[in-house]
Amino acid sequence: MGLPKGPEGQGLPEVETREDEEQNVKLTEILELLVAAGYFRARIKGLSPFDKVVGGMTWCITTCSFDVDVDLLFQENSTIGQKIALSEKIVSVLPRMKCPHQLEPHQIQGMDFIHIFPVVQWLVKRAIETKEEMGDYIRSYSISQFQKTYSLPEDDDFIKRKDKAVKTVVGLSDAYKPRRKYRRQRGAEELPDEESRVHSTLLEYGRRYGFSRQSKTEKAEDKKTALAAGLSAAEKVDAHEEDELQAAEEQRIQSLMTKMTAMANEESRLTASSVGQIVGLCSEEIKQIVSEYAGKQSELSAEESPEKLGTSQLHQRKVISLNKQILQKSKHLEELQANHTSLKAKYSDRKKTLTELKDHGEKLDKEQAALEKLEAKADPSMLQNLRALVAMNESLKSQEQEFKAHCREEMARLQQEIETLKAERAPGEKIISGGEPQGALTSTMTHNEDLDRRYNMEKEKLYKIRLLQARRNREIAILHRKIDEVPSRAELIQYQKRFIELYRQISAVHKETKQFFTLYNTLDDKKVYLEKEISLLNSIHENFSQAMASPAARDQFLRQMEQIVEGIKQSRMKMEKKKQENKMRRDQLNDQYLELLEKQRLYFKTVKEFKEEGRKNELLLSKIKAKAS
C-alpha cells in the first residue's frame, strides 16, 4: 500500500489496492472461512469483495452478541466516506471483543486481505464457539421446558416407585437405628481413659464388647502356630491368661453397669422444672383440661366396657355429654350470630357510603362532561378572557377581604383613640359642672370638633390612597402577567429542543406506520393470490373427473387451462413490470440522495471557506486600522 508524498498530496493518505496473487489467495481463504461459518451471502457473485468481507465481519460480530452501529438496509455503491465510517465502526468493536490482532480502517477500505485474514479467522472461531455455547444453552433450555410439560415412561416409573422406596428406607432406618437403653447416673465419677468412655457409651446402647478380646481369626492363627510348634505348655498359659482377661472384662462391665440406670425409669419421672411449668398454668385452663380429660375418659370407658355398666348409667352419661355439646354449640351459635349482625351492619353502612360516592361521582362526571361540551363549543379567545376575568375576580375578592380587615383594625384603633380622648376630657367636665366659667367648655367643644374634622379628612385621604394603591397593584399584576407570558431565551431553546424531539418521534412513528401499511398491503395481495390459487385448484379438482370422461370435454378443459395459464403469465408480467419500475424509482432516489450528500458536503466546505475568508478579512481590517491609527 503506497502513500504519495508529492507537493500537493503530502500528508493525505491515498489507499491503493494490491492486486497480486497473495491478496487473491487470502480473499479466497476469507470467503471460504465465512461460508464454512454459515455466512452464505459470500457466495453471491454480484457483490464486491468489500461488501462480502465487511458483511461477513459484521455478521460474526453480531453472532458473538456484540453491537455494531451500522445501517440495517443494504446500500450498494457506497461512497468512500461511508466505507471508511463503516470500517471505523467495525474496528472500534474489535478491542471490546479482546481481539489479539490489530486492524486499521484504511486496511479494510483498501482491501488489504493479508492483514484482514487473521482478524476474520479469529472472528469465525469466536462465532463458532458462541454458536456452540448458544446451542448447548438452547438444548438444555428445551429439555427443561419439555420436562416441565411431558415425561418419559422411565420417569413415570421412577416417580411411582419413589414414595414407596422412600417410605421403606425411612422405616428401615427407624427400625434399626440405635436406641439408648441405659444412662450414666448423675454424680458418678468420670472415666479416666478414652477406651473406658467408648466402652461405657456402647454399653448405654446395649452393646457388650470386650477390651482385649481377640478375634476368631487371630485365635485360629494362634492355634495353628501352637499346633505346628507343639507347645502344649504355651497353650495352657494362653488359656489361663484368656480366662483372666475375660474375668477382668466382666468385672469392668459390671462396675460400669452399676453406675447406669434404665431409660424407662428416667423417662417416667417428672423433673422439678416440668412440675413448676404445670403448676404455673392458669387455674381456668387446668379446670378446662381436667373436665375435658374426665369427659374423654368416661367416653373411652363407655366404649371399651359397655357391658360392665347399666343401661341407666349409660343413658345418663350420654345425656350429660349431649347437653355439654348442646351448650357449647349454642354459645358458638350466639357468638356467630352477634358477629354476623355486626358484619351485616358494617356491610350496609359501607354499601350506603359506596352508593353515595357513586352518585356523587356520576354527578361530577356529568357536570364535567357538560363543561367540556361548553368549552368545546365556546370561542377559545372568549374562554381565555373569561378565565382571566375569573382569576381577576378571585384576586379582587381576596383584596377586598384584606381591605375590610385593615379597615376594621383602623376603626378599632380610632375608637380606642376616641375613648382615650374622652377619658382625658372627663376631668374638665367635672370642673365645669363644679362652677367653672363657660369659656373652658366652649374651647373644649371647639377642640373636639377640630379633632373630628381632622379625623374625617385623614380617613378620606387614607381611602383615596388605598384606592390608588389597589389601582397600582392591579397595573403591576397585569404587567407581571404580560412579562411572564413572554418566554425567555432558555425557554425558547427548550421549546425548540422539545419540538425537534417531537418531530423526530412523529417521523419515526410515521415511518413505522408506513412500513406496517406496506406490509399489510403485501400480505393482503399475497392472501388474494393464494385464495385465487386455492379456488382454481379446487375447480380443477372438481372438474377433472368430468373433463376426462369424454374427448370433447377434455379438449375444452385443456383450452380453459391454457387460458388460465396465459392470464397468470400476463399477471406475472405486470408484477414484474411494476417491480422494475419500483427498482428504477429506488435507483433514481438513491442517485438523488447521493447528489444531495455531495451538495451537503460542498455546502459545509463552502461555509468553512467562507468563515476562513471572513476571519482573514477581519484580520486585515484590524491591521489596516492599526496602521491608520
Swiss-Prot record:
Keyword Phosphoprotein listed: yes
Cell compartment(s), UniProt: Early endosome
Key words of the record: Coiled coil, Endosome, Phosphoprotein, Protein transport, Transport
Sequence segments annotated as region (Disordered): 1-23
InterPro entries: CCDC93, CCDC93_CC, CCDC93_N
Pfam families given in the database record: CCDC93_CC (PF09762), CCDC93_N (PF21673)
Superkingdom classification of source: Eukaryota
UniProt feature coiled coil, ranges: 231-430, 558-599
Phosphoserine carried by residues: S298, S301, S305
Protein transport found in the keyword field: yes
GO cellular component: early endosome
Region of interest: Sufficient for interaction with CCDC22: 1-428
Function statement: Component of the commander complex that is essential for endosomal recycling of transmembrane cargos; the commander complex is composed of composed of the CCC subcomplex and the retriever subcomplex. Component of the CCC complex, which is involved in the regulation of endosomal recycling of surface proteins, including integrins, signaling receptor and channels. The CCC complex associates with SNX17, retriever and WASH complexes to prevent lysosomal degradation and promote cell surface recycling of numerous cargos such as integrins ITGA5:ITGB1.
Subunit structure of this chain's protein: Component of the commander complex consisting of the CCC subcomplex and the retriever subcomplex. Component of the CCC (COMMD/CCDC22/CCDC93) subcomplex consisting of COMMD1, COMMD2, COMMD3, COMMD4, COMMD5, COMMD6, COMMD7, COMMD8, COMMD9, COMMD10, CCDC22 and CCDC93. Forms a coiled-coil heterodimer with CCDC22; this heterodimer interacts with the guanine nucleotide exchange factor DENND10; the interaction is direct. Interacts with WASHC1. Interacts directly with WASHC2C. Interacts with SNX17 and SNX31.
Protein name per the record: Coiled-coil domain-containing protein 93
Gene (name only): Ccdc93
